[in-house]
Amino acid sequence: MIWNGRLVLACVLLIAGCSGQVDAARTREQRKAFGSPNIVLPPGPAHEVASAKPARALGEKTFTLRHVYHHGTHNYPNLHRYIDIQPESKLQVSYDDGTTYEEAEVAFKAKAQSRIVQRMAHRSHSDIDAVQVHYFTYGQPADVEWTEDEIAGPNISDKSTVLTFAKMAANAYIFSRKDGEWQPVKGGFNYTDDFGWEQDGLRGHIFADEANSTVVIGLKGTSPAIFDGADTTGNDKLNDNLFGSCCCAQGGPFTWKKVCDCAGSSAYTCNNTCLVKSLREKGHYYWAVKDLYRNVTERYPDSEVWLSGHSLGGVVSSLLGLTYGLPTLTFEAFPDAMAASRLGLPTPPGYKIGSHQARPMTGIHHFGHTADPIYMGSCNGGTSFCSIGGYAFEGVCHTGETCTYDTVRDLGWRVGIGTHKIVSVIKDVIKVYDQPPSCEQDVECVDCYNWKYFENNGTETTTSKASTATSTTTRTRTETCKTPGWWGCLDESTTSAPTTSTSTSSSTSSTRTCETPGWFGCKDETTTTSSSSSISSPSATPAPTITTTSSLPTSTSTSTCKTPGWFGCYDESTTTSATPKPSSTARTVTKTKTTTSDDDDCTSREWFGLICVDPSPTTASGSSPSSTNLPTTRRKMCTKRHWYGTCKQWRFDDFDPKNDL
């Protein structure tokens, strides 16, 4: 039985796993099936300008690690530190989240090319802050001036460049006292005596070329541990569920880590005002990366800034790139269009806030492969590892363009969360393919299509009226049972009629005498029972008058059983007589049990009638033995047994008397 249960469980898990794999490796056409056919793209010269000015090669740049910035978020929101990396420092780096370390590369080479990016004309930090405050205050985008600039960016069609940016997004360095000390930015708070600050916050690695004309910020992504407590997993999970779920990880499996209370009273409804307020809290990664970017640009005011990130670091990088119009390359980032919409990131004329997936010329490029369910936007089933670990990845739409390696078709990979790690992407994907994949937009993509969002400014009042209903039902029932069964009467017949305002009272008296107790009750039960019942209806309320006469039998039973069984007598025959009296409320039943089976002269039994304790048979004659009158010897033998071993039928063999020699 246990083996069968395990087999069924294995089959269920196999089916669930197969279904999750098929859904995770969705093609672009399958993802478009969830889109809205009513989306109309706004007119504009974007594509014409882009085609009129093809990308130009701008040579190769060599980057070196210059600084590492760390910005606190939850436990230390005011912490902002940096450490300068000296040119002679020999560092160790890990590409698999601290499992193994190797000598860090000294230089990173990447090719540059020109591209056109559509962004705001005025992008100072104060200008960006004013635009976002306007949206959060009035719920409408601010009227600002936009421009299309030709800038330098990484060459996304070059394999070595893509590989370099993946390494910048993946690295985690080990520092020693010889490499320098962590210094507070702008003389900030001193956290020297606090332990654990390095596990709280966002870390960015700053790379610069020889002329300091271009700076690359590589942001650290989500820690790989499923459960809280390892590295920055707890804080990363909170931001993942804020950015990637439809409503703060509510309305899904119970394992999801809920990060706010914005769900509506009905299913698939969410308070958008509450949702935006949760994202605006100072401790979240978007605001931390804005402060980090502000300090880097103050240190390199005349440099172009490029961004790179993996997983959550890639999402934060793309949000920063959309805000300031910066070239960005991300790796295995989960869909980020939903987060950009809720943060109120500015959009050019002709686009409403929330349509970032339909915008061209953003400068955002997301690299990933089809075997990663997080990147594909399908790691959200109840049995998926993301849901088991508490992550709620419900979005399916990326901003900008997606550049997808089809590892399921080309390499025969199976879909699994283990392929999400950046070390797997670097060694098994980017280095294996000869060229990077082509990049494209998914303009018809729609997030959370089955959810309804409503606005709430906190002034609405809700009035509810309670209604009460009173009903009284009385059931009158007459029963006569002739064939009692194991759990009740087998031939039960019932008549019932509902009435209103009816009261019923009854009294019963019983006398029982048992001579032969059985396994589950008395075998020769003799019972005398009298019962009376009355029903009355008040005269205040007109109602039908119902009179019920109930009579219970008075029975007399005599039983003699020679072959008792496990649950009763096997040789029982019953004769029942009853004398009905129409004018009486009771009837008398006489039951006589006669046994007609093989002789069994047992007169004393124990153990519920199963064991005979009579002495061995002896002669019944009262005369003394003589040569003509000898005692009779009888041999008792069992001819048929029960399934549990006791004798069911006996046989007695008589022997002729023998004369004394």
Curated annotation (Swiss-Prot):
<feature type="compositionally biased region" description="Low complexity">
    <location>
        <begin position="574"/>
        <end position="595"/>
    </location>
</feature>
<feature type="transmembrane region" description="Helical; Signal-anchor for type II membrane protein">
    <location>
        <begin position="4"/>
        <end position="24"/>
    </location>
</feature>
<dbReference type="GO" id="GO:0034496">
    <property type="term" value="P:multivesicular body membrane disassembly"/>
</dbReference>
<feature type="glycosylation site" description="N-linked (GlcNAc...) asparagine">
    <location>
        <position position="271"/>
    </location>
</feature>
<keyword id="KW-0812">Transmembrane</keyword>
<dbReference type="GO" id="GO:0032585">
    <property type="term" value="C:multivesicular body membrane"/>
</dbReference>
<feature type="topological domain" description="Cytoplasmic">
    <location>
        <begin position="1"/>
        <end position="3"/>
    </location>
</feature>
<keyword id="KW-0442">Lipid degradation</keyword>
<feature type="glycosylation site" description="N-linked (GlcNAc...) asparagine">
    <location>
        <position position="212"/>
    </location>
</feature>
<feature type="glycosylation site" description="N-linked (GlcNAc...) asparagine">
    <location>
        <position position="295"/>
    </location>
</feature>
<keyword id="KW-1133">Transmembrane helix</keyword>
<dbReference type="Pfam" id="PF01764">
    <property type="entry name" value="Lipase_3"/>
</dbReference>
<dbReference type="GO" id="GO:0005775">
    <property type="term" value="C:vacuolar lumen"/>
</dbReference>
<keyword id="KW-0072">Autophagy</keyword>
<dbReference type="GO" id="GO:0046461">
    <property type="term" value="P:neutral lipid catabolic process"/>
</dbReference>
<dbReference type="GO" id="GO:0004620">
    <property type="term" value="F:phospholipase activity"/>
</dbReference>
<protein>
    <recommendedName>
        <fullName>Putative lipase ATG15</fullName>
        <ecNumber>3.1.1.3</ecNumber>
    </recommendedName>
</protein>
<feature type="active site" description="Charge relay system">
    <location>
        <position position="311"/>
    </location>
</feature>
<keyword id="KW-0472">Membrane</keyword>
<feature type="compositionally biased region" description="Low complexity">
    <location>
        <begin position="493"/>
        <end position="513"/>
    </location>
</feature>
<keyword id="KW-0967">Endosome</keyword>
<dbReference type="GO" id="GO:0034727">
    <property type="term" value="P:piecemeal microautophagy of the nucleus"/>
</dbReference>
<keyword id="KW-0325">Glycoprotein</keyword>
<keyword id="KW-0735">Signal-anchor</keyword>
<feature type="glycosylation site" description="N-linked (GlcNAc...) asparagine">
    <location>
        <position position="190"/>
    </location>
</feature>
<comment type="subunit">
    <text>Binds to both phosphatidylinositol (PI) and phosphatidylinositol 3,5-bisphosphate (PIP2).</text>
</comment>
<dbReference type="GO" id="GO:0004806">
    <property type="term" value="F:triacylglycerol lipase activity"/>
</dbReference>
<feature type="topological domain" description="Lumenal">
    <location>
        <begin position="25"/>
        <end position="661"/>
    </location>
</feature>
<feature type="region of interest" description="Disordered">
    <location>
        <begin position="492"/>
        <end position="559"/>
    </location>
</feature>
<feature type="glycosylation site" description="N-linked (GlcNAc...) asparagine">
    <location>
        <position position="457"/>
    </location>
</feature>
<dbReference type="InterPro" id="IPR029058">
    <property type="entry name" value="AB_hydrolase_fold"/>
</dbReference>
<comment type="similarity">
    <text>Belongs to the AB hydrolase superfamily. Lipase family.</text>
</comment>
<feature type="region of interest" description="Disordered">
    <location>
        <begin position="574"/>
        <end position="597"/>
    </location>
</feature>
<dbReference type="InterPro" id="IPR050805">
    <property type="entry name" value="ATG15_Lipase"/>
</dbReference>
<keyword id="KW-0378">Hydrolase</keyword>
<comment type="function">
    <text>Lipase which is essential for lysis of subvacuolar cytoplasm to vacuole targeted bodies and intravacuolar autophagic bodies. Involved in the lysis of intravacuolar multivesicular body (MVB) vesicles. The intravacuolar membrane disintegration by ATG15 is critical to life span extension.</text>
</comment>
<keyword id="KW-0443">Lipid metabolism</keyword>
<feature type="glycosylation site" description="N-linked (GlcNAc...) asparagine">
    <location>
        <position position="155"/>
    </location>
</feature>
<dbReference type="GO" id="GO:0006660">
    <property type="term" value="P:phosphatidylserine catabolic process"/>
</dbReference>
<feature type="compositionally biased region" description="Low complexity">
    <location>
        <begin position="527"/>
        <end position="559"/>
    </location>
</feature>
<dbReference type="InterPro" id="IPR002921">
    <property type="entry name" value="Fungal_lipase-type"/>
</dbReference>
